[in-house]
């Protein structure tokens, strides 16, 4: 059971809002996550991102692999 850090989509049509979650690689995009780690709102100006650095570092230490988009968010907003 590999764990990935990925985005789940919320919000209405054409107004996306995403949660950053830890979920197994077999879990559907909007399936039940293991833990919520933050959120990403691309519709605001500037873009609103809130990440729980402690939880993300804990999951990365356990071997969780972030998706490309989540990796970019971590790199940009946790640096």
Swiss-Prot record:
Pfam families given in the database record: Ribosomal_S16 (PF00886)
GO MF annotations, alphabetized: structural constituent of ribosome
InterPro entries listed in its UniProt record: Ribosomal_bS16, Ribosomal_bS16_dom_sf
Keywords attached to this entry: Ribonucleoprotein, Ribosomal protein
Gene Ontology BP, a term: translation
Example of a GO cellular component annotation carried by this entry: cytoplasm
Protein family according to the UniProt entry: Belongs to the bacterial ribosomal protein bS16 family.
Name of the protein described by the UniProt record: Small ribosomal subunit protein bS16
Gene coding for it: rpsP
